[in-house]
């Protein structure tokens, strides 16, 4: 089964709710339209309710989605208190209130943290750093995971590849590379891919030399262990 069809099948009956912080962006609105029409997932869009509803009504989408205005949300004070607690002395109540009003990614991540939604998709108009930072500060990593890494899922016909890390870690050491490889394999399994790991470098069968090649060789050994 094609990877995205498999994902949609797995979500049937789960009542999943996914927040889309960039809710007024046309590409996000088109994505929300497809989500409503093609899946059982409920998109939760952040932004101006009137703008979003008018756009989706013109597109023929009258129900199956939710809109949250961060400036008038019923449990906003609860979100502020929870964010202050989560940051443990690194953010005042006033700072938390301001960032939740101004930054839709922080608002979206707090919805995930509080269990109001099941996940978040962002990054259409925000940088990787602006998208990932709130998640690192609030949700954090799984236990025993030392570093966060990114991964891209590439589909070429019936072939599926997952590349990591091409977004977050600039120059990881050998131990970091090994952990990224292992976590990428775990991510691949989530998409129904039986992972076979390839460690990439500019050396082909030992033809190249240097510190970066040595690091990849060492990372491969660590990953095997």
Question: Residues of each region from the PLM?
Answer:
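Anion-binding alpha/beta catalytic cores of soluble intermediary-metabolism enzymes, centered on
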Residues: 1-225
């Amino acid at each position: 089964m094609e990877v995205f069809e498999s994902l949609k099948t797995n979500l049937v009956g789960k009542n999943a709710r996914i927040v889309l912080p960039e809710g007024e962006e046309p590409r996000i609105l088109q994505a929300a339209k497809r989500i409503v029409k093609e899946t059982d997932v409920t998109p939760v869009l952040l932004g101006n309710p009137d703008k979003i509803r008018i756009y989706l009504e013109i597109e023929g989408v009258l129900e199956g989605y939710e809109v949250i205005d961060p400036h008038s949300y019923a449990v906003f004070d609860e979100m502020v208190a929870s964010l202050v607690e989560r940051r443990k002395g690194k953010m005042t109540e006033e700072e938390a209130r301001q960032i939740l009003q101004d930054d839709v990614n922080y608002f979206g991540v707090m919805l995930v943290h509080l269990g109001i939604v099941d996940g978040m998709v962002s990054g259409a108009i925000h940088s990787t750093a602006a998208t990932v930072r709130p998640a690192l500060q609030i949700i954090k990593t799984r236990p025993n995971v030392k570093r966060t890494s990114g991964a891209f899922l590439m589909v070429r016909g019936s072939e599926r590849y997952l590349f990591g890390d091409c977004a977050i870690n600039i120059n990881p050491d050998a131990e970091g590379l090994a952990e990224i490889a292992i976590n990428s394999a775990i991510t691949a399994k989530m998409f129904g891919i039986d992972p076979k790991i390839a460690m990439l470098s500019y050396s082909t069968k030992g033809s190249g030399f240097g510190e970066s090649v040595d690091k990849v060789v060492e990372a491969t050994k660590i990953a095997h262990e």
